[in-house]
């Protein structure tokens, strides 16, 4: 029995299968419930952010605060999620995945209750910071669990599957938020979010087994964690994919932070109309993410797909800036909504592939690698967030400028640091679930790529055994 009561079985059977070709259908290897649970964990950040979005104008009025100050409630939550991942990721490498995850979810629930009770915008900002710090455990450990269970192309497929689940959150969250505002005020949004946090925590407690065996945990303290992160950042490709994903996320978060004001204040849409548009954009992201996982991965180089995604984001951001500047005259909401839909949909082939390509560079420090991935994304997003409000609420130019600048920097990092034209390990032909072709870099002093057949077989035996263990816990 693992910690918390979730049962584990069939480990030896899975380990014995190390020489077989892994089944790339994620739910068959991991179990439907655990797959859904991991997706729910990755959905905690969009739930915490997006459910609250329709209430931003009301918070501005209710707490008598300027829009820029209210937007800090988004920025601080995002910054908390960034910094929290740096702490929780290495903790999960040392103490396993379950205990830090359960502790983080508990604090998240308490912080959400305090947000609902906040009497001033200053306290709301502080409580949102605490909420973000605690919520970081969900996303960073979910990614680390995936890395525990999968390698190579199978990992890329699984991330796309998680996007199908976690992508429901941006669709449903603003709709829930908009409906809550019909019957109560903005505080009710945090009450509902508290209930969701309790439900996810209960599922983790009862259904998610430990995926990092004690023998593979790091025994060192802060020093070892820092050395591990330094080793990861010394790998230019890992750093390049991490920064590429971070700046792509900044373009996404510029939309998240500014769109409530652009759509509701500039174009006069209701909170319910905004929620529907936001949900439609999230549908585009989910659908494209599934095309990525079920059609493109294994057939087209991940680097090539990522490059196409970045080009689409850049094109959509350019169109938004031209419309915001009035180059085409007075533009109605529809063309702006189309451009935002295209930008959001392109994230479905951008974000999961940057995560998979970066995590292919490491195996023995998945928590630290996941922490660096998440921290860069959330920290860069937190910096971008207040920039969209510097010119006030009556123009969309700052949002478009931030999106375009972020897309340009993301593309520069991808081309300049990742050097996709030299990639030989992320092509369609290497979809056997083994971390193929990543012989260039070392992660925390351990060679990330293994070209020796025996070593690869051992690595696959471990991940197969873990997947069998999780499947046993889900049955």
Set out the residue ranges of the language-model regions.
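Juxtamembrane intracellular "pre-TM" segments in multi-pass secondary transporters
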Residues: 19-27, 211-242
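Helix-breaking motifs and short loop linkers at transmembrane-helix boundaries and internal kinks
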Residues: 62-64, 96, 117-123, 134, ...
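Conserved MFS/SLC helix-loop-helix module at the cytosolic interface between two early adjacent transmembrane helices
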Residues: 83-122
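Structural signature of the two symmetry-related core transmembrane helices
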Residues: 99-114, 194, 304-320
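Paired small-residue
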Residues: 107-114, 122-130, 334-339
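Helix-loop-helix hairpin linking two adjacent transmembrane segments in secondary transporters
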Residues: 119, 123, 160-208
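Cytoplasmic helix-loop-helix junction between adjacent transmembrane helices
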Residues: 127-166
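A late C-terminal transmembrane helix in Major Facilitator Superfamily
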Residues: 355-393, 403
């Amino acid at each position: 029995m693992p910690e918390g009561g979730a049962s584990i079985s069939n480990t030896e059977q899975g380990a014995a299968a190390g020489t077989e070709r892994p089944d790339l259908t994620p739910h068959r290897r991991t179990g439907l419930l655990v797959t859904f649970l991991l997706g729910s964990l990755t959905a905690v950040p969009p739930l915490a952010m997006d459910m609250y979005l329709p209430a931003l104008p009301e918070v501005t009025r209710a707490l008598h605060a300027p829009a820029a100050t209210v937007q800090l409630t988004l920025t601080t939550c995002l910054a908390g999620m960034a910094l929290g991942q740096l702490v929780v990721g290495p903790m999960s490498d040392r103490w396993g995945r379950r205990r830090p995850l359960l502790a983080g979810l508990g604090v998240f629930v308490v912080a959400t209750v305090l947000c609902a009770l906040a009497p001033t915008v200053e306290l709301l900002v502080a409580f949102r910071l605490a909420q973000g710090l605690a919520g970081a455990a969900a996303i960073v450990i979910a990614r680390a669990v995936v890395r525990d269970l999968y390698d190579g192309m199978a990992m890329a497929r699984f991330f796309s599957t998680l996007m199908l689940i976690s992508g429901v959150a941006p669709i449903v969250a603003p709709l829930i938020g908009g409906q809550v505002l019909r019957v109560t005020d903005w505080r009710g949004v945090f009450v509902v979010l508290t209930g969701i946090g309790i439900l996810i925590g209960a599922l983790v407690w009862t259904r998610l087994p430990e995926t990092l065996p004690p023998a593979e945990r790091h025994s060192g303290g802060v020093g070892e964690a820092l050395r591990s992160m330094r080793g990861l950042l010394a790998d230019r490709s890992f750093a390049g994919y991490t920064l590429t994903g971070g700046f792509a996320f900044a373009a996404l978060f510029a939309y998240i932070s500014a769109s409530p004001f652009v759509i509701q204040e500039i174009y006069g849409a209701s909170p319910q109309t905004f929620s529907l548009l936001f949900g439609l954009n999230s549908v585009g992201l989910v659908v494209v993410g599934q095309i990525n996982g079920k059609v493109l991965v294994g057939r087209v180089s991940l680097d090539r797909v990522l490059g196409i995604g970045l080009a689409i984001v850049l094109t959509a951001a350019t169109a938004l800036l031209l419309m915001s500047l009035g180059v085409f005259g007075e533009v109605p909401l529809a063309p702006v909504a189309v451009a935002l839909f295209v930008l959001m949909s392109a994230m479905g082939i951008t974000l999961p592939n940057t995560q998979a390509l970066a995590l292919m560079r490491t195996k023995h420090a998945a928590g630290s690698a996941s922490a660096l991935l998440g921290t860069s994304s959330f920290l860069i997003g937190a910096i971008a967030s207040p920039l969209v409000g510097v010119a006030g609420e009556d123009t969309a130019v700052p949002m478009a400028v931030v999106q375009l600048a972020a897309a340009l920097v993301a593309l520069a990092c991808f081309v300049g640091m990742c050097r996709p034209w030299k990639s030989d390990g992320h092509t369609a032909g290497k979809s056997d679930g083994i971390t193929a072709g990543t012989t260039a870099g070392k992660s925390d002093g351990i060679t990330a790529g293994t070209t020796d057949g025996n070593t690869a077989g051992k690595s696959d035996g471990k991940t197969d055994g873990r997947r069998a263990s999780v499947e046993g816990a889900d049955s």
